[in-house]
Every structure is written in structure tokens, then in C-alpha cells.
């Protein structure tokens, strides 16, 4: 009898989640494409005096080749290291001075960067994203690549090699996908 009550309670709890499944969250937005092909999605919310800029590139570790992995994640790091009009070290410094929180991440299918900052600093975030998108090569050097390669290696040691079960995130994809599938290797490289 006790098992029956527990089972009934579980089904009741699971079923109660479906009662709200019909509700949809509607977020109004405007979507347009710039002449250079960049898709822009804008959602306005004036309830707080902050703005978020989120730039997504349709490239991730899934775009890499067998035996040549980790480049998407490496470039995620390199794109913080200055560009044609932004000296090395100034990207984060300028954003922090404006009261921003920023970061980037890489997955199998995308690399993204975001800035969350006061509304009056929107132009700064757009300038920085535009400059790193258009003028990265002006500031590239073998030293920057080597420096960030070392940072990524250290990140791998901290988050995978020296963590309980950390290696599982490297082993799991190898066992879920065929060796030639772009999801069979870890994002970090």
C-alpha cells in the first residue's frame, strides 16, 4: 500500500508539471540582418538601466577536424587579447571601468561573448565587439597565441585533469559518438 501511495504521488507530481506546459513565455523582439550578413536580435526592457550585448559565432569545436581540436576554444581566449583599436589588456579593463560583467564560452556549435553593463555604456560594448570582430588580425602575434595556449592548458588541468570525475567530460563524448564525429572530442581540445 505504501509503495502504491508513493507511486501515485510521483505521478501526481510529474503530471502537475504538464498543467503549466501550455503556457508560453513570449518575449517581444526585433530581428534584422545588416548588409555584412550579421543577424541582430534586439529585445528592449526598460525596467532596469542595464543592457546586455551577446554575440554568437556559428563556430565551435564541432567545426574542427579529427586530430586538430581545441582551436575554437583557443580563439575564444585570443579574442579577449586586444584588436586593431583596442590595446592588449584594455578590453576587460575598459568594460570593468564602465561597470560591466563580461565573459565568453565555447560549445560544440557556437562561440559566444557577452557584456552586461549600464545602459549608458552600450556604445562601448558595441565598439569592442565590432573591433574584435573586424580587426583581430591587426593585433595577432605568435606570442599571444602561445600565451593563450598556455592559459587553455592550465584551464584543462584545473577543470578536467585535477577534478574528481573531470575526465568524464572527455571520455563521455568518445563513447557516445563515432571517432570521426565532431562531437566525439571535448570542446577544450
Regions found by a protein language model. Name each.
Residues 1-8:
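Bacterial N-terminal signal peptides that target proteins for export
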Residues 10, 24, 48-49, 65, ...:
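Alpha-helical protein-protein interaction elements
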Residues 9-13, 17:
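Hydrophobic helical h-region of N-terminal Sec-dependent signal peptides
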Amino acid at each position: 500500500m505504501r509503495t502504491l501511495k508513493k507511486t501515485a504521488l510521483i505521478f501526481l507530481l510529474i503530471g502537475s508539471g504538464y498543467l503549466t506546459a501550455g503556457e508560453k513565455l513570449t518575449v517581444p523582439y526585433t530581428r534584422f540582418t545588416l548588409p555584412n550578413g550579421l543577424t541582430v536580435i534586439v529585445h528592449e526592457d526598460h525596467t532596469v538601466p542595464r543592457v546586455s550585448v551577446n554575440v554568437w559565432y556559428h563556430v565551435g569545436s564541432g567545426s574542427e577536424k579529427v586530430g586538430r581540436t581545441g582551436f575554437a576554444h583557443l580563439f575564444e581566449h585570443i579574442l579577449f587579447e586586444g584588436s586593431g583599436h583596442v590595446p592588449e589588456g584594455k578590453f576587460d579593463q575598459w568594460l570593468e571601468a564602465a561597470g560591466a560583467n563580461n565573459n565568453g564560452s565555447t560549445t560544440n556549435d557556437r562561440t559566444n561573448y557577452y557584456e552586461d553593463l549600464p545602459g549608458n555604456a552600450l556604445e562601448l560594448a558595441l565598439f569592442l565587439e565590432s573591433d574584435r570582430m573586424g580587426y583581430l588580425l591587426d593585433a595577432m602575434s605568435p606570442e599571444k597565441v602561445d600565451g593563450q595556449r598556455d592559459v587553455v592548458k592550465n584551464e584543462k588541468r584545473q577543470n578536467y585533469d585535477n577534478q574528481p570525475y573531470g575526465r568524464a567530460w572527455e571520455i563521455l563524448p568518445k563513447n557516445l559518438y563515432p571517432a570521426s564525429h565532431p562531437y566525439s572530442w571535448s570542446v577544450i581540445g
